[in-house]
Each structure stands twice: as structure tokens, then as C-alpha cells.
A protein has these predicted regions:
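Residue-level detector of conserved catalytic or cofactor/ligand-binding positions
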Residues: 328-339
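Generic transmembrane alpha-helix motif of multi-pass integral membrane proteins
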Residues: 134-144, 254-260, 311-316
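Long hydrophobic alpha-helical segments that form multi-pass transmembrane helix bundles
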Residues: 170-254
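Structural signature of hydrophobic alpha-helical transmembrane segments
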Residues: 94-110, 145-154, 236, 240-250, ...
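C-terminal ends of transmembrane helices
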Residues: 42-48, 112-124, 160-170, 255-263, ...
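A beta-strand-loop signature enriched in Asp, Gly, Thr, and Trp
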Residues: 271-327
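Membrane-interface helix-loop-helix junctions at boundaries between adjacent transmembrane segments
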Residues: 126-207
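N-terminal signal-anchor module of multipass membrane proteins
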Residues: 1-105
Length: 340
């Protein structure tokens, strides 16, 4: 890294004012900041000095997402091999899932960061690190069969209209990943719901077995179509069920929650308030006793482990930019988020 640092210092004058590559200063600054801690710090005014900056915050959030992402990759392979009748080892299932998910991660980052680089160049501003988190969140909240071109369109839409039009990182009032999910759901509903999107029916480099028209329902989807309340099982906790790539494993998500809380990046009040609010609303619907509504009959604890609720409580409600900042607002905002 020292050699790279020396090389960047050597070419840096070319990107400063008066240099022959001054037009690309924001690109150079973004690349340098990504690799090394910025050398400039605020010394006056109302700034609060701390050992952590935005790059470290975003890096910690990405690290906290890794357990859920890795398990999601394995689960993609597990669901494919289980429902197609193919045989494969743990390693083969993980590699299959890795190869299925990796293109979505690449598309998300290429499109999102590409737009941020273009906007930074146009506005002659530094490139921010905000999309480091959004770029990994977006592939984790979509089904494995979501087409890459649709993911690219949704990512571009959310970065432009939910972030850049408000001023970029730290200025946006909406969560970019959630806007991506909402755009996909309303613009391409058949690619985000139903029974044909949750399990891949394709082979990847000879692994797995190709099955045309493979349909597998999620526990909530099965409850909606059959009218039968799903029985609680440990698979709902471990995550060995069909669902969006990174949202199924409660255990992996809670490992990420521990990382966020231990480093102080997320507020425990926000997380607990979402879980408490969700459990309370589920209990209310149970008490009302809606006989014709299967979801209202589900036990409160099943609501907390299905449908991405846990993922939303840990990673969406605690978003550093769009979440509440004061203690009272953290509690009330989270309580309002949980019923949704």
C-alpha cells in the first residue's frame, strides 16, 4: 500500500487546479479517498471531531451485511438444488449462489457509482462513499431471478431521483435501496412477486439442473394463496426458505446487528422499537380475530422472522442518512415503521 500511496502522491498534482487532468479531479479524489483516509479535517466551526468518518461508517455497514449476503448466496444454491432435484455439496451450492448473485452486485455498483461519478464531475464536487452501502443492499433485497437490465434501470432511477436531485449523499430524504425496491415492485411486479422468481431454474457453468417454469412459493406467498397459516419452523430462523437474496436468515441478520450496535453505527433503540412495534401490531390483529385474513391470524413471532421484517429493522430503519437522530424521534419513527 505504501508503493500505491507514493504513486498517487506523485500523480496527484496532475489532477489539482492547473494540472492537465484537472477536469477529472473529483474522480481522482474519490479513488484516493476510497483507498486511504482523507488528509484534510475540519478545524473550526461547529464540526464534531470523532475517530470515525463517513467512509468508516459505510465500511462498517458493508461488513455487517456480509453474513447475510454470504448466507443468501448459499441459500440461492440450496433452493435451486433442493427444488430441481439436482445433487450437490455445500461448496457447490455456495458457488452456484455466488455466481448467480455476483452479476447483480456488479450491475448495482457499476450503474450507481457510474451515475455518482458523472454527477460529481458535472458539479465539480468530491465523490462520496454513500453508494458503498446502497450498492450491496440493492442486490440483497431482490429475487434471484430479477433480470439484470431491470435491476440496472431501477438502480439508475433511485440514484437519480431519490438521491442526486436532493443534493447527493447526506441530503437525500429517501432510502435509495427502498426506492429501488418500490420502483421494481410497481414497475415490474411480475419480476418481484409470484411463485416463479424466488428460485433459479438455470444452470451456471454446468452446475445445477435447468428446469423450465420452476415455481416455488415463499411461506407468506403460500399463506396468501392457500389461506393456511404457515407452521413455525427453524428454517424460518436459519433462512433456508425461498425469499429475496439477503433477507431470509434471521441469524445472519442478527450477527450484522451485533456489529452495528457494537461499533455504535446503529441505535439499539431504533431496532428494538421496530421489533416491539411489529410484535404489538401483530398481537393486535391476532386479538381482533380476522377469520378471513390469513396474515392477521399468523402468530406475532412469525411476522418478525418472515417477509424481510428482520432485515428492514436492522439495516433499513437504521440507515445513517434517512433514519431519525434524536432519542425520542428514534423511538416514535421506528414504532411507525414497524406496522408497515
Amino acid at each position: 500500500m505504501k508503493a500505491l500511496r507514493n504513486y498517487l502522491d506523485k500523480i496527484k498534482p496532475n489532477f489539482e487546479e492547473g494540472g492537465k487532468f484537472h477536469a477529472f479531479q473529483s474522480v481522482f479524489d474519490g479513488f484516493e479517498t476510497f483507498l486511504f483516509v482523507p488528509s484534510k479535517t475540519a478545524k473550526t466551526g461547529t464540526h464534531i471531531h470523532d475517530a470515525i468518518d463517513s467512509k468508516r461508517i459505510m465500511s462498517i455497514v458493508v461488513i455487517s451485511l456480509v453474513p447475510a449476503l454470504l448466507f443468501g448466496m448459499y441459500n440461492v444454491g440450496y433452493q435451486h438444488f433442493t427444488h430441481t432435484g439436482a445433487t450437490g455439496s455445500f461448496f457447490e451450492m455456495f458457488i452456484y449462489g455466488f455466481l448467480a448473485v455476483l452479476p447483480k452486485i456488479i450491475v448495482s455498483y457499476v450503474v450507481g457509482l457510474g451515475i455518482e461519478f458523472i454527477v460529481a464531475q458535472w458539479k465539480k464536487e468530491e465523490i462520496q462513499e454513500g453508494f458503498l452501502v446502497s450498492g450491496i443492499l440493492i442486490p440483497m433485497i431482490v429475487p434471484v431471478d430479477c433480470p439484470l437490465w431491470i435491476l440496472a434501470v431501477a438502480t439508475a432511477f433511485s440514484v437519480i431521483f431519490a438521491k442526486e436531485v436532493f443534493g447527493g449523499t447526506g441530503m437525500n430524504i429517501f432510502n435509495v435501496a427502498l426506492i429501488t425496491r418500490a420502483f421494481l415492485f410497481f414497475a415490474y411486479p411480475t419480476k418481484m412477486s409470484g411463485d416463479a422468481v424466488w428460485v433459479s431454474g438455470d444452470t451456471i457453468f454446468g452446475m445445477g439442473q435447468a428446469v423450465d417454469g420452476l415455481t416455488v412459493a415463499t411461506p407468506l406467498g403460500l399463506a396468501a394463496t392457500t389461506g393456511t397459516v404457515p407452521e413455525f419452523s427453524m428454517d424460518m430462523v436459519t433462512g433456508l426458505i425461498p425469499g429475496s437474496i439477503g433477507e431470509t436468515s434471521v441469524i445472519a441478520i442478527l450477527i450484522g446487528a451485533v456489529i452495528l450496535l457494537w461499533t455504535g453505527v446503529a441505535s439499539w433503540k431504533t431496532m428494538i422499537s421496530v421489533f416491539v412495534g411489529g410484535a404489538f401490531m401483530a398481537w393486535v390483529f391476532n386479538a381482533i380475530g380476522m377469520e378471513n385474513n390469513t396474515m392477521a391470524q399468523m402468530p406475532w413471532y412469525e411476522h418478525l422472522v418472515l417477509g424481510g421484517f428482520c432485515f428492514g429493522a436492522v439495516f433499513m430503519a437504521t440507515d445513517p442518512v434517512t433514519s431519525a437522530r434524536t432519542e425520542r424521534s428514534e423511538e416514535h419513527t421506528s414504532e411507525l415503521q414497524s406496522p408497515s
